[in-house]
Amino acid sequence: MRHPLSIPEVMLNGCYKGIPGHTPPFPLDKISDRNWNILKGDMTFPCAVLRSSALERNQMWMKRFLEQEDAVLCPHGKTTMSPELFSLQLKGGAWGLTAATIQQIQTYRAFDVQRILHANQLVGMAEIDYVCKELNENPSFDFYTLVDSPALVRILSDRAEINQTNLQVLIEVGQAGARTGVRSIDQAKAVCDAIAESPRIKLRGIETYEGIIQGPNDEEIETAIEALYSTLSQVAIMAESRGFFNQGPVILSGGGSAYYDMAARGVAAVPLQTERLHVIRSGCYLTHDAKWLDDYFQRMQIRTEVVGEPLNPPQEAIELWANIHSIPESGRCFATLGKRDASHDIHLPALKKWFRPGEHSQPTKLDGHKIVALNDQHAYIDMPANSPLAIGDMVAMGISHPCTTFDKWRFMPIVDDDYSVIAGISTWF
């Protein structure tokens, strides 16, 4: 997908976190003209920044991985909901974008995204009618959605007939006790039969998502993931043997957010005779993180050899900067950042660096300090007796789970390795 996106003009002012209050409104795409630098105190804190070198590194890492695994990437846009980052991903070779909700689909279309894989069920009348209208009015729009029941197939078929358009679907394979998706081959056959009865619904592939599988240890989780992809394989073989797939390559898709290798190899192992396309849907690869995804990556290195690694692993691209603003007692300080600024659903942010304006030329690694709690606007930090931190110092934090940090920022600056602001991104949650 090389189609240029339509990126809306965003005017920044002091209502955006990070922008000084008396700054006259200016377009986001002109932010480099401000000559701002994070370390010089040109922006207000807290401030979430994206490191340009890490974004580029992670993009190249994924490209090499996909080439090695003979797969394509349809990254989940819910991670960033940023047209600027969507454009970066599509220019980097992404096959399309994945969406989970109708709001995300509508937002992507506002940016003129031409291929969308809706990794969820499309069920509401208004939602189905919107997609049908987009397909009718835009012949280049390529759209896929998931089905896991004959009832849903009939709902889609009825609305598609009313709108006089066709809908491409993938059968979702799930797991007992987990989320959506057929649980058995018999359920999948019933869905296939319903699709075959509709002239408007076209079966294009099989899909699953392994990222929600839980277990007492890594080995049992990985065994369950292998079983899930075995079921996907059986469903695909059944659908091919009965002639259910429509014209075009059969799409075999896995999530891959934390299990890139298992998703890519799980779909590649399906023994079909038909031409096929292996699609993984990770959105978090672009920014990586400090703990959650990094732990998964370390585990992947144990499972498999990945091209270029470990010499050039992904890097965390998101940093949250704040000031130390209070040291009210021994062993405890506070930073100007909280739940409104950082993800906290999996792990709390981790202190990485500190910087003292007027004394340091570059940020320095900060060991022995730990964020132990967050309020809405405060970070509680345990500090050792020999801590160098003082009121007014700047601290940088790494995060876990990029999705729930991006949704707290309408704007993020992109910085070079000297923390000069060279660009920026907007988000549309």
Where do the model's predicted regions map?
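A charged N-terminal "starter" segment
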Residues: M1-K133, I425-F429
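A non-catalytic, amphipathic alpha-helix used as a structural packing/dimerization or gating element
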Residues: S53-W61, A190, A227-Q234, V395
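Active-site-proximal beta-alpha core segment in soluble small-molecule metabolic enzymes
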Residues: P75-D218, A227
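Active-site loop/helix belt of alpha/beta enzymes
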Residues: Q168, G174-R303
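Active-site loop ensemble at the mouth of alpha/beta enzyme cores that anchors a bound cofactor
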Residues: T223, Y260-P357
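C-terminal accessory subdomain/extension
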Residues: I327-F429
